[in-house]
Amino acid sequence: MALFNSAHGGNIREAATVLGISPDQLLDFSANINPLGMPVSVKRALIDNLDCIERYPDADYFHLHQALARHHQVPASWILAGNGETESIFTVASGLKPRRAMIVTPGFAEYGRALAQSGCEIRRWSLREADGWQLTDAILEALTPDLDCLFLCTPNNPTGLLPERPLLQAIADRCKSLNINLILDEAFIDFIPHETGFIPALKDNPHIWVLRSLTKFYAIPGLRLGYLVNSDDAAMARMRRQQMPWSVNALAALAGEVALQDSAWQQATWHWLREEGARFYQALCQLPLLTVYPGRANYLLLRCEREDIDLQRRLLTQRILIRSCANYPGLDSRYYRVAIRSAAQNERLLAALRNVLTGIAPAD
């Protein structure tokens, strides 16, 4: 039975209510947010420009779209900012109006919700535990002319796995040849050093739509900022016309403009994840009764080999919240997702897991 009503991580209010404590007393490993926090440059810009909330945002978000265009070296007409990447998912689903779409499971729940709202028939391609939850070329044969679009998350959520580039290119080529729109969710790709994703390939393939998020990497989930990128100017113009006006608030737009210029923050994040991510992964692998999947992003998928242990409930008693993956199609109650946080926070989780899985209290 599900412990929480929410279909997503980061629901610290509900978890704190279960415990009868304040939300700030919980250590949250359920939301995949950069533990370095918001860049200082962004925080300073927001404080210095608070009076911008007394005016309507620029309806065209000219400066934000220009900043995103410079960042990716593409025309601004290819980009449409949204109130978090989730809004962009719903925008592209309602704008394309597919009759039949394929989604890969386990995966982010909002693809299915957005497609269902558009009255679309949904087909599911199931990743296999036997393949380590990695996408394989078997999906190519499932891409048939009667499909209108395919949603892929790269790296995938909740597995953190990124398919090999040749396979992704083969999928993109097949989608183009069959007139299938390929929607690539690259929400977590910024955490992978020097991984450009598929935005550079858009000029040669207007069938590719890329979803991006600034929420996770720059730690601004409360502001909400994502965007959609596609090289078909006419199609993007249609998306723009159907989007709700003033979808992005003024502070979120400003945060995006400033964050994209902070290359030092990008380097600091990559350094943290390279060092702490590797250490945390190895430490988790040393724990008994736990299988850890080698994700590329800022979170890891775990499988507990003791079905009688509800890790989420047990850790919650120690005021630590992790994400149960039982509600992901294809996964079950043995699976959990944990964010990679600071070394001290990760040590606290490791000690709690060790205590639960072995019954041996960690040494002082």
Swiss-Prot record:
Under InterPro entries, the record lists: Aminotransferase_I/II_large, CobD, NHTrfase_class1_PyrdxlP-BS, PyrdxlP-dep_Trfase, PyrdxlP-dep_Trfase_major, PyrdxlP-dep_Trfase_small
Functional pathway: Cofactor biosynthesis; adenosylcobalamin biosynthesis
Q: Where does O-phospho-L-threonine bind?
A: H8, G9, N32, N157, R323, R337
Q: What is a GO molecular function of this protein?
A: identical protein binding
- Keywords from the named record: Cobalamin biosynthesis, Lyase, Pyridoxal phosphate
Q: Which GO terms describe its biological process?
A: cobalamin biosynthetic process
Q: What is its EC number?
A: 4.1.1.81
* UniProt function note: Decarboxylates L-threonine-O-3-phosphate to yield (R)-1-amino-2-propanol O-2-phosphate, the precursor for the linkage between the nucleotide loop and the corrin ring in cobalamin.
* Matches recorded under NCBIfam families: L_thr_O3P_dcar
Name listed for the protein in its UniProt record? Threonine-phosphate decarboxylase
Q: Which organism is it from?
A: Salmonella typhimurium (strain LT2 / SGSC1412 / ATCC 700720)
GN (gene name): cobD
